[in-house]
């Protein structure tokens, strides 16, 4: 369940499905990798990725803050952080470009599609979402 961090209310279906056309907002998403972990004695690499909605997209979706945080647990220990981030960004944007609209649920679906690979074991999500109240 996704909640608004200001009011602690659950996000409604209308708020989650609210979308805009992707060509109306230039550079709608900002991708940031803030940690790469290599646990000892395993063949696992954990990528901590944050997707931020830019100002124009937040304004169009009536959001105050939208940070989507993901931990991607992979068996791919060859890819560096920047290599995996570029691949991840490309797959997410490919999905959204094909869909044509961008919103909260569509970005989460795009991440689910981008991480549906044989080398990905788990994807953990922790989102920071605040809607404009005023």
Curated annotation (Swiss-Prot):
Keyword Acyltransferase attached: no
Disulfide bond positions: none
Pfam families attached to this UniProt entry: Gemini_AL3 (PF01407)
InterPro entries: Gemini_AL3 (IPR000657)
GO biological process: viral process
Keyword Transcription among UniProt keywords: no
Record's keyword terms, sorted: Host-virus interaction
Stated role: Increases viral DNA accumulation. Enhances infectivity and symptom expression.
Subunit structure as annotated in this protein's UniProt entry: Homooligomer. Interacts with the replication-associated protein (REP). Interacts with host proliferating cell nuclear antigen (PCNA). Interacts with host retinoblastoma-related protein 1 (RBR1), and may thereby deregulate the host cell cycle. Oligomerization and interaction with PCNA are necessary for optimal replication enhancement.
Family: Belongs to the geminiviridae replication enhancer protein family.
UniProt name for this protein: Replication enhancer protein
């Amino acid at each position: 369940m996704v909640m608004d961090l200001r009011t602690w209310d659950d996000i409604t279906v209308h708020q989650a499905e609210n979308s805009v056309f992707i060509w109306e907002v230039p550079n709608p998403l900002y991708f940031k990798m803030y940690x790469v972990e290599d646990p000892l004695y395993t063949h696992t690499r954990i990528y901590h990725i944050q997707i931020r909605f830019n100002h124009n997209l937040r304004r169009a979706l009536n959001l105050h803050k939208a940070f989507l945080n993901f931990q991607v647990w992979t068996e791919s220990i060859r890819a560096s952080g920047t290599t995996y981030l570029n691949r991840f960004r490309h797959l997410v944007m490919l999905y959204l470009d094909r869909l044509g609209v961008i919103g909260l649920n569509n970005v989460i679906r795009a991440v689910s599609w981008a991480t549906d690979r044989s080398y990905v074991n788990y994807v953990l999500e922790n989102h920071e979402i605040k809607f404009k109240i005023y």
